[in-house]
Amino acid sequence: MATCACTGQAIGTAAALCNEKDVLPAQLRKNHIRELQQRLLRDDQSIRKVTNKDPDDLARIASVSASDHLEGAEPLHIIDGKVRDVPTQWDHRWGAKAIDGGQWIELAWDGPVLLDEVQITFDSGFHRQLTLSASDGASRNIIRGPQPEMVKDYQISYVDDSGARQGLVDIEGNYLRLRRHRFAAIQVRSLRLHALTTHATEQIRVFEIRCYSRKE
């Protein structure tokens, strides 16, 4: 369940926010609890009945399209505010068959937006146990190393204000669930994640894409 990890993350984030706002924990709970929750969600924490409502996340106001999708694994799921799914269900993920050349999903805005950060949450097989154990019985079915669902190679490109497509990110050998890419601010009309390969599965799986213009 990783309850110690989840609790530690929540306490540490709350302490940092108290320091940032120069308030006591009781004041944080009374006046800033929603901000704390949203910050935890942004860092891939999961809170029951709380979804992404981050006003700074520009992906939330974008339209979403994709090269293809599996039944029930709609492209719009990547901005529904949730990054967990019940096993075998696709209520909060975009999914598409892994093919030669990969699959893409794209965010588009009505007009150009200024971006300098893109955050992606991939599927890392949270439904499957991954524990440290000296027991052969417990370890027998545990998959070590990069999880099979994980997108391995991917690219990010965008259409700029002139209508030209530009390359932005090219990643090989990814094994991380949460990826943040930061770059010099750019004007963007649309942003495309092109998932090329996975580590083992036959489906491309993405939970969420967020887009930000960082505040100095």
Feature map (PLM): residue ranges:
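Aromatic, loop-rich ligand-recognition surfaces of beta-strand-rich domains
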Residues: 85-167, 173-216
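Glycine-rich phosphate/pyrophosphate-binding beta-alpha loops
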Residues: 1-3
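Non-catalytic terminal regions with compositionally biased, polar/charged low complexity
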Residues: 19-54
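Predominantly extracellular/luminal regions of secreted and cell-surface proteins
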Residues: 54-84
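Short clusters of small/polar residues that mark proteolytic maturation junctions
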Residues: 15, 169-170
